[in-house]
Amino acid sequence: MGPAELVQKISINAESPRGGERNDCGAGAERGPAGGWRQKCAAYVLALRPWSFSASLTPVALGSALAYRAEGALDPRLLVGSAVAVLAVHGAGNLVNTYYDFSKGIDHKKSDDRTLVDQILEPQDVVRFGVFLYTVGCICAAGLYAVSTLKLEHLALVYFGGLSSSFLYTGGIGFKYVALGDVVILITFGPLAVMFAHAVQVGYLSVSPLLYAVPLALSTEAILHSNNTRDMESDQQAGIVTLAIIIGPAFSYVLYTVLLFLPYLIFCVLATRYTISMALPLLTIPMAFSLERQFRSQNFNKIPQRTAKLNLLLGLFYVFGIMLAPAGALPKL
Protein backbone atom coordinates (compact mmCIF):
# COMPACT_ATOMS: atom_id res chain seq x y z
CA MET A 1 0.00 0.00 0.00
CA GLY A 2 1.42 3.37 -1.06
CA PRO A 3 1.56 6.52 1.07
CA ALA A 4 -1.26 8.16 -0.94
CA GLU A 5 -3.55 5.14 -0.48
CA LEU A 6 -2.77 5.03 3.25
CA VAL A 7 -3.66 8.72 3.71
CA GLN A 8 -6.93 8.20 1.77
CA LYS A 9 -7.92 5.20 3.95
CA ILE A 10 -7.21 7.11 7.18
CA SER A 11 -9.31 10.03 5.92
CA ILE A 12 -12.29 7.74 5.14
CA ASN A 13 -12.10 6.05 8.57
CA ALA A 14 -11.99 9.43 10.35
CA GLU A 15 -15.10 10.65 8.54
CA SER A 16 -17.14 7.48 9.23
CA PRO A 17 -18.82 7.26 12.68
CA ARG A 18 -17.84 4.36 14.90
CA GLY A 19 -20.35 1.57 15.37
CA GLY A 20 -21.07 2.62 18.94
CA GLU A 21 -21.69 6.21 17.81
CA ARG A 22 -24.08 5.06 15.08
CA ASN A 23 -26.05 2.99 17.58
CA ASP A 24 -26.19 5.84 20.06
CA CYS A 25 -27.40 8.29 17.43
CA GLY A 26 -29.97 5.85 16.15
CA ALA A 27 -31.26 5.09 19.61
CA GLY A 28 -31.45 8.80 20.41
CA ALA A 29 -33.36 9.45 17.21
CA GLU A 30 -35.81 6.72 18.11
CA ARG A 31 -36.16 7.85 21.71
CA GLY A 32 -36.76 11.51 20.79
CA PRO A 33 -40.16 11.17 19.06
CA ALA A 34 -41.29 8.44 21.47
CA GLY A 35 -40.37 10.60 24.45
CA GLY A 36 -42.15 13.54 22.85
CA TRP A 37 -45.33 11.52 22.33
CA ARG A 38 -45.21 10.23 25.88
CA GLN A 39 -44.85 13.78 27.17
CA LYS A 40 -47.72 14.96 24.98
CA CYS A 41 -49.99 12.10 26.08
CA ALA A 42 -49.15 12.86 29.71
CA ALA A 43 -50.00 16.51 29.03
CA TYR A 44 -53.39 15.54 27.61
CA VAL A 45 -54.10 13.48 30.73
CA LEU A 46 -52.99 16.36 32.97
CA ALA A 47 -55.25 18.79 31.09
CA LEU A 48 -58.19 16.42 31.72
CA ARG A 49 -57.55 16.72 35.50
CA PRO A 50 -58.44 13.07 36.15
CA TRP A 51 -58.27 13.55 39.93
CA SER A 52 -61.56 15.47 39.61
CA PHE A 53 -63.44 12.62 37.88
CA SER A 54 -64.87 11.42 41.20
CA ALA A 55 -67.26 14.36 40.83
CA SER A 56 -68.82 12.70 37.76
CA LEU A 57 -68.36 8.99 38.50
CA THR A 58 -69.96 8.94 41.96
CA PRO A 59 -73.19 10.69 40.83
CA VAL A 60 -73.56 8.12 38.03
CA ALA A 61 -73.02 5.29 40.52
CA LEU A 62 -75.50 6.87 42.93
CA GLY A 63 -78.19 7.38 40.28
CA SER A 64 -77.77 3.79 39.09
CA ALA A 65 -77.95 2.46 42.66
CA LEU A 66 -81.16 4.42 43.27
CA ALA A 67 -82.61 2.97 40.06
CA TYR A 68 -81.69 -0.54 41.20
CA ARG A 69 -83.38 -0.03 44.57
CA ALA A 70 -86.49 1.34 42.85
CA GLU A 71 -86.80 -1.18 40.01
CA GLY A 72 -84.87 -4.20 41.29
CA ALA A 73 -82.83 -4.40 38.08
CA LEU A 74 -79.85 -2.66 36.50
CA ASP A 75 -78.84 -2.63 32.84
CA PRO A 76 -75.00 -2.69 32.69
CA ARG A 77 -75.06 -1.24 29.16
CA LEU A 78 -76.87 1.85 30.40
CA LEU A 79 -74.55 2.09 33.41
CA VAL A 80 -71.41 2.04 31.24
CA GLY A 81 -72.95 4.32 28.61
CA SER A 82 -74.04 6.94 31.12
CA ALA A 83 -70.65 6.80 32.88
CA VAL A 84 -68.74 7.33 29.61
CA ALA A 85 -71.11 10.12 28.52
CA VAL A 86 -70.78 12.00 31.80
CA LEU A 87 -67.00 11.45 31.95
CA ALA A 88 -66.60 12.71 28.38
CA VAL A 89 -68.59 15.87 29.12
CA HIS A 90 -66.66 16.40 32.37
CA GLY A 91 -63.30 15.93 30.63
CA ALA A 92 -64.30 18.28 27.81
CA GLY A 93 -65.41 20.87 30.37
CA ASN A 94 -62.02 20.63 32.07
CA LEU A 95 -60.31 21.24 28.72
CA VAL A 96 -62.53 24.28 28.10
CA ASN A 97 -61.48 25.49 31.56
CA THR A 98 -57.80 24.97 30.70
CA TYR A 99 -58.18 26.87 27.42
CA TYR A 100 -60.01 29.89 28.82
CA ASP A 101 -57.92 30.14 31.99
CA PHE A 102 -54.82 30.29 29.78
CA SER A 103 -56.44 32.76 27.35
CA LYS A 104 -57.35 35.10 30.20
CA GLY A 105 -53.88 34.86 31.76
CA ILE A 106 -55.11 33.10 34.90
CA ASP A 107 -52.90 30.00 34.67
CA HIS A 108 -49.25 30.51 35.62
CA LYS A 109 -46.09 28.50 36.30
CA LYS A 110 -47.36 27.41 39.73
CA SER A 111 -50.78 26.24 38.53
CA ASP A 112 -51.80 22.58 38.77
CA ASP A 113 -52.38 22.45 35.02
CA ARG A 114 -49.45 24.01 33.14
CA THR A 115 -49.90 22.19 29.83
CA LEU A 116 -50.46 25.44 27.91
CA VAL A 117 -48.30 27.64 30.13
CA ASP A 118 -45.29 25.36 29.56
CA GLN A 119 -46.20 25.06 25.85
CA ILE A 120 -46.38 21.27 26.06
CA LEU A 121 -49.68 21.52 24.19
CA GLU A 122 -50.88 24.24 21.85
CA PRO A 123 -54.29 25.89 22.41
CA GLN A 124 -55.62 24.30 19.21
CA ASP A 125 -54.65 20.85 20.57
CA VAL A 126 -56.80 21.44 23.64
CA VAL A 127 -59.69 22.72 21.50
CA ARG A 128 -59.57 19.68 19.20
CA PHE A 129 -59.45 17.27 22.13
CA GLY A 130 -62.38 19.04 23.78
CA VAL A 131 -64.46 18.80 20.58
CA PHE A 132 -63.56 15.11 20.33
CA LEU A 133 -64.74 14.43 23.89
CA TYR A 134 -67.99 16.36 23.41
CA THR A 135 -68.56 14.27 20.26
CA VAL A 136 -67.92 11.06 22.21
CA GLY A 137 -70.42 12.19 24.83
CA CYS A 138 -73.07 12.89 22.18
CA ILE A 139 -72.50 9.49 20.56
CA CYS A 140 -72.94 7.84 23.97
CA ALA A 141 -76.13 9.84 24.54
CA ALA A 142 -77.47 8.61 21.18
CA GLY A 143 -76.61 5.05 22.19
CA LEU A 144 -78.40 5.51 25.51
CA TYR A 145 -81.52 6.68 23.66
CA ALA A 146 -81.39 3.54 21.50
CA VAL A 147 -81.25 1.25 24.55
CA SER A 148 -83.20 3.17 27.22
CA THR A 149 -86.97 3.68 27.35
CA LEU A 150 -86.47 7.31 28.40
CA LYS A 151 -88.19 9.83 26.11
CA LEU A 152 -85.90 11.64 23.71
CA GLU A 153 -86.93 15.09 24.92
CA HIS A 154 -86.21 14.14 28.55
CA LEU A 155 -82.84 12.62 27.67
CA ALA A 156 -81.89 15.66 25.59
CA LEU A 157 -83.03 18.08 28.29
CA VAL A 158 -80.87 16.54 31.01
CA TYR A 159 -77.86 15.63 28.86
CA PHE A 160 -77.56 18.91 26.97
CA GLY A 161 -78.27 20.79 30.18
CA GLY A 162 -75.16 19.17 31.65
CA LEU A 163 -73.14 19.67 28.46
CA SER A 164 -74.05 23.36 28.29
CA SER A 165 -73.14 23.84 31.95
CA SER A 166 -69.75 22.19 31.48
CA PHE A 167 -68.96 24.58 28.61
CA LEU A 168 -70.44 27.76 30.07
CA TYR A 169 -68.55 27.27 33.35
CA THR A 170 -65.58 29.02 31.73
CA GLY A 171 -66.58 29.32 28.05
CA GLY A 172 -69.08 31.79 26.63
CA ILE A 173 -70.64 33.58 29.60
CA GLY A 174 -67.94 32.17 31.89
CA PHE A 175 -69.92 31.59 35.09
CA LYS A 176 -66.68 30.86 36.93
CA TYR A 177 -65.44 34.40 36.37
CA VAL A 178 -68.55 36.11 37.76
CA ALA A 179 -68.87 34.15 41.03
CA LEU A 180 -71.51 31.75 39.66
CA GLY A 181 -69.22 28.78 39.07
CA ASP A 182 -70.11 27.27 42.45
CA VAL A 183 -73.81 27.24 41.54
CA VAL A 184 -73.09 25.55 38.19
CA ILE A 185 -70.96 22.82 39.79
CA LEU A 186 -73.42 22.31 42.64
CA ILE A 187 -76.23 21.64 40.16
CA THR A 188 -74.36 19.82 37.38
CA PHE A 189 -72.16 17.42 39.34
CA GLY A 190 -74.87 16.53 41.80
CA PRO A 191 -78.60 16.57 41.06
CA LEU A 192 -78.29 16.71 37.26
CA ALA A 193 -75.79 13.85 36.89
CA VAL A 194 -77.63 11.67 39.42
CA MET A 195 -80.97 12.33 37.69
CA PHE A 196 -79.42 11.50 34.30
CA ALA A 197 -78.04 8.13 35.43
CA HIS A 198 -81.29 7.27 37.24
CA ALA A 199 -83.55 8.32 34.35
CA VAL A 200 -81.80 6.27 31.65
CA GLN A 201 -82.17 3.18 33.85
CA VAL A 202 -85.83 3.57 34.88
CA GLY A 203 -87.10 5.34 31.75
CA TYR A 204 -88.64 8.40 33.41
CA LEU A 205 -87.65 11.55 35.29
CA SER A 206 -88.09 11.56 39.06
CA VAL A 207 -87.62 14.07 41.88
CA SER A 208 -86.24 11.61 44.45
CA PRO A 209 -82.73 11.39 42.90
CA LEU A 210 -82.41 15.16 43.36
CA LEU A 211 -82.93 14.78 47.11
CA TYR A 212 -80.49 11.90 47.43
CA ALA A 213 -77.91 13.88 45.45
CA VAL A 214 -77.64 16.64 48.08
CA PRO A 215 -74.86 15.07 50.25
CA LEU A 216 -72.80 14.26 47.18
CA ALA A 217 -73.34 17.72 45.68
CA LEU A 218 -72.11 19.38 48.88
CA SER A 219 -69.00 17.21 48.91
CA THR A 220 -68.33 17.99 45.24
CA GLU A 221 -68.72 21.72 45.86
CA ALA A 222 -66.07 21.38 48.60
CA ILE A 223 -63.58 20.37 45.88
CA LEU A 224 -64.25 23.51 43.85
CA HIS A 225 -64.33 25.80 46.87
CA SER A 226 -60.98 24.51 48.15
CA ASN A 227 -59.51 25.10 44.69
CA ASN A 228 -60.90 28.64 44.48
CA THR A 229 -59.73 29.49 48.01
CA ARG A 230 -56.22 28.31 47.17
CA ASP A 231 -56.22 30.42 43.98
CA MET A 232 -57.73 33.58 45.50
CA GLU A 233 -54.61 35.71 45.06
CA SER A 234 -53.94 34.75 41.43
CA ASP A 235 -57.65 35.04 40.57
CA GLN A 236 -57.78 38.56 42.01
CA GLN A 237 -54.70 39.55 40.02
CA ALA A 238 -56.37 38.22 36.87
CA GLY A 239 -59.46 40.33 37.58
CA ILE A 240 -61.98 37.50 38.02
CA VAL A 241 -64.46 37.11 40.85
CA THR A 242 -65.20 33.87 42.72
CA LEU A 243 -67.29 33.16 45.77
CA ALA A 244 -64.11 32.62 47.79
CA ILE A 245 -62.92 36.13 46.89
CA ILE A 246 -66.27 37.70 47.79
CA ILE A 247 -66.57 36.13 51.25
CA GLY A 248 -62.85 36.27 52.12
CA PRO A 249 -60.55 33.73 53.82
CA ALA A 250 -62.38 33.52 57.17
CA PHE A 251 -65.82 32.80 55.71
CA SER A 252 -64.25 30.57 53.06
CA TYR A 253 -63.02 28.38 55.90
CA VAL A 254 -66.51 28.35 57.46
CA LEU A 255 -68.11 27.43 54.14
CA TYR A 256 -65.56 24.67 53.47
CA THR A 257 -66.21 23.22 56.92
CA VAL A 258 -69.98 23.24 56.32
CA LEU A 259 -69.53 21.57 52.93
CA LEU A 260 -67.32 18.91 54.51
CA PHE A 261 -69.47 18.00 57.51
CA LEU A 262 -73.09 18.69 56.52
CA PRO A 263 -73.24 15.47 54.43
CA TYR A 264 -72.33 13.48 57.56
CA LEU A 265 -75.21 15.08 59.45
CA ILE A 266 -77.56 13.99 56.65
CA PHE A 267 -76.17 10.45 56.78
CA CYS A 268 -76.70 10.35 60.55
CA VAL A 269 -80.36 11.29 60.07
CA LEU A 270 -80.81 8.65 57.36
CA ALA A 271 -79.07 6.00 59.47
CA THR A 272 -81.10 6.66 62.63
CA ARG A 273 -84.49 7.11 60.95
CA TYR A 274 -84.35 4.58 58.10
CA THR A 275 -81.51 2.06 57.90
CA ILE A 276 -78.15 1.59 59.60
CA SER A 277 -76.45 0.93 56.25
CA MET A 278 -76.58 4.67 55.62
CA ALA A 279 -73.96 5.08 58.36
CA LEU A 280 -71.28 3.60 56.08
CA PRO A 281 -70.12 7.02 54.77
CA LEU A 282 -69.28 7.99 58.36
CA LEU A 283 -66.19 5.79 58.00
CA THR A 284 -64.61 8.62 56.01
CA ILE A 285 -65.06 11.27 58.69
CA PRO A 286 -61.41 11.07 59.91
CA MET A 287 -60.35 12.23 56.42
CA ALA A 288 -62.76 15.16 56.71
CA PHE A 289 -61.22 16.24 60.03
CA SER A 290 -57.74 15.99 58.52
CA LEU A 291 -58.82 18.21 55.60
CA GLU A 292 -60.44 20.71 57.97
CA ARG A 293 -57.18 21.04 59.92
CA GLN A 294 -55.17 21.47 56.72
CA PHE A 295 -57.56 24.13 55.42
CA ARG A 296 -57.57 25.96 58.78
CA SER A 297 -53.77 26.11 58.74
CA GLN A 298 -53.99 27.59 55.21
CA ASN A 299 -51.84 24.81 53.81
CA PHE A 300 -53.61 24.48 50.47
CA ASN A 301 -51.04 22.19 48.84
CA LYS A 302 -52.95 19.37 47.09
CA ILE A 303 -56.09 20.09 49.13
CA PRO A 304 -58.42 20.00 46.07
CA GLN A 305 -57.01 16.58 45.15
CA ARG A 306 -57.38 15.32 48.73
CA THR A 307 -60.94 16.65 48.88
CA ALA A 308 -61.68 14.84 45.61
CA LYS A 309 -60.36 11.62 47.16
CA LEU A 310 -62.70 12.11 50.12
CA ASN A 311 -65.54 12.78 47.67
CA LEU A 312 -64.83 9.49 45.89
CA LEU A 313 -64.71 7.39 49.07
CA LEU A 314 -67.74 9.10 50.59
CA GLY A 315 -69.67 8.53 47.36
CA LEU A 316 -68.72 4.87 47.17
CA PHE A 317 -69.76 4.21 50.77
CA TYR A 318 -72.99 6.10 50.09
CA VAL A 319 -73.70 3.85 47.10
CA PHE A 320 -72.88 0.73 49.12
CA GLY A 321 -75.21 1.93 51.87
CA ILE A 322 -78.08 2.29 49.40
CA MET A 323 -77.40 -1.10 47.82
CA LEU A 324 -77.34 -2.80 51.24
CA ALA A 325 -80.51 -1.11 52.48
CA PRO A 326 -83.50 -3.47 52.94
CA ALA A 327 -86.22 -3.19 50.31
CA GLY A 328 -88.56 -0.33 51.10
CA ALA A 329 -86.37 1.01 53.91
CA LEU A 330 -85.43 4.24 52.15
CA PRO A 331 -87.99 7.01 51.52
CA LYS A 332 -89.40 7.61 48.02
CA LEU A 333 -87.84 4.45 46.61
UniProtKB/Swiss-Prot annotation:
Give the record's keywords alphabetically: Endoplasmic reticulum, Golgi apparatus, Membrane, Menaquinone biosynthesis, Mitochondrion, Prenyltransferase, Transferase, Transmembrane, Transmembrane helix, Ubiquinone biosynthesis
Enzyme Commission number, as recorded: 2.5.1.-, 2.5.1.39
Kindly indicate whether the keyword Endoplasmic reticulum belongs to this entry.
yes
The record describes the protein's role as: Prenyltransferase that mediates the formation of menaquinone-4 (MK-4) and coenzyme Q10. MK-4 is a vitamin K2 isoform required for endothelial cell development. Mediates the conversion of phylloquinone (PK) into MK-4, probably by cleaving the side chain of phylloquinone (PK) to release 2-methyl-1,4-naphthoquinone (menadione; K3) and then prenylating it with geranylgeranyl pyrophosphate (GGPP) to form MK-4.
- Report the GO molecular function annotations: antioxidant activity; prenyltransferase activity
Q: In which pathway does it act?
A: Quinol/quinone metabolism; menaquinone biosynthesis; Cofactor biosynthesis; ubiquinone biosynthesis
Q: How does it sit in the membrane?
A: Multi-pass membrane protein
Which family does the record claim for this protein?
A: Belongs to the UbiA prenyltransferase family.
- Species whose genome carries this gene: Gallus gallus (Chicken)
Region annotated Disordered, chain positions = 13-33
Q: What is this protein called in UniProt?
A: UbiA prenyltransferase domain-containing protein 1
Entry GO CC: endoplasmic reticulum; endoplasmic reticulum membrane; Golgi membrane; mitochondrial membrane
The keyword Transferase belongs to this UniProt entry's keyword annotation: yes
Q: Which reaction does it catalyse?
A: menadiol + (2E,6E,10E)-geranylgeranyl diphosphate = menaquinol-4 + diphosphate; all-trans-decaprenyl diphosphate + 4-hydroxybenzoate = 4-hydroxy-3-(all-trans-decaprenyl)benzoate + diphosphate
GO annotation, biological process: circulatory system development; endothelial cell development; menaquinone biosynthetic process; ubiquinone biosynthetic process; vitamin K biosynthetic process
Say which enzyme class the record assigns: transferase
One Pfam match, given by its short name, reads: UbiA
User: Where found in the cell?
Assistant: Endoplasmic reticulum membrane; Golgi apparatus membrane; Mitochondrion membrane
Membrane-crossing segments per the record: 78-98, 129-149, 155-175, 177-197, 199-219, 240-260, 265-285, 310-330
